């Protein structure tokens, strides 16, 4: 596929009708994912596999338990090595949730043009514990399921914001590469999602 054609086919994917939704996925596929965007925010928690995640011109080389913040309308795609299984948690978050303070990390990721959270071992264990409890709660039919699930979601997002806003993560320049040409095209697309995004327009 030609360089400009990759971006002319950018489309909105996924629909979210609740405040948040958690997925735990493990698969092995040869499918190539096109650049796309969502109307909601997304957190990707990478567990295992060989994946390069492209967000707005940056290509992140992921390590186990890396976390990615994908702002709504941010154009992104995953580049997956099909030779090994790819396991991850995906958290979708509605833009109009009651707790707007929890969206600050996405806004800051957009401002910094940096989306990766790489944790030290102590913080990694803390976030793992909350995440696994959240997953268990979403699958439970026990008393107070909705309240417990919501409280665990809030815990996870509060800690995620603290870590990112206070820069408690490990910053490693070798963890990503940056392509200014791609970044310029994606920036144009991001500001013109309802306009003509044909190959001719993008390559003009």
What are these regions (language model features)?
Residues 42-45, 126, 130-133, 152, ...:
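Amphipathic, well-ordered alpha-helical segments in soluble domains
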Residues 73-98:
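Ligand-binding loop in jelly-roll beta-barrel domains
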Residues 38-41, 151, 180:
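Aromatic- and histidine-enriched alpha-helix N-cap/loop-to-helix transition segments
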Residues 113-124, 138-149, 158-204:
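Short, Lys/Arg-enriched, Trp-marked, Pro/Gly-tolerant hinge/linker segments that flank
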Residues 1-67, 74, 82, 99-111:
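Generic protein-terminus/edge-of-domain signal
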Residues 94-103, 124:
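Helical hydrophobic small-molecule/effector-binding pocket
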């Amino acid at each position: 596929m030609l360089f400009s054609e990759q971006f002319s086919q950018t489309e909105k994917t996924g629909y979210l009708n609740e405040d948040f939704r958690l997925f735990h996925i493990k698969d092995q596929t040869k499918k190539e994912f096109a650049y796309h965007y969502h109307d909601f925010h997304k957190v990707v928690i990478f567990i295992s596999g060989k994946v390069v995640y492209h967000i707005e011109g940056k290509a992140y080389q992921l390590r186990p338990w890396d976390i990615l913040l994908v702002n709504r309308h941010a154009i992104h795609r995953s580049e997956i090595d099909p030779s090994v299984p790819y396991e991850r948690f995906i958290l979708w978050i509605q833009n109009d949730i009651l707790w707007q303070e929890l969206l600050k990390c996405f806004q800051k990721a957009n401002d910094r043009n940096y989306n990766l959270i790489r944790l030290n071992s102590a913080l990694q264990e803390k976030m793992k514990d909350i995440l696994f409890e959240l997953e268990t709660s979403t699958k439970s039919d026990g008393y107070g399921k909705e309240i417990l699930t919501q409280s665990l979601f809030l815990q996870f997002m509060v800690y995620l914001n603290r870590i990112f806003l206070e820069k408690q993560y490990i910053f490693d320049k070798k963890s990503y590469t940056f392509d200014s040409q791609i970044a310029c095209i994606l920036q144009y697309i991001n500001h013109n999602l309802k306009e003509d995004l044909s190959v001719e327009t993008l390559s003009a």
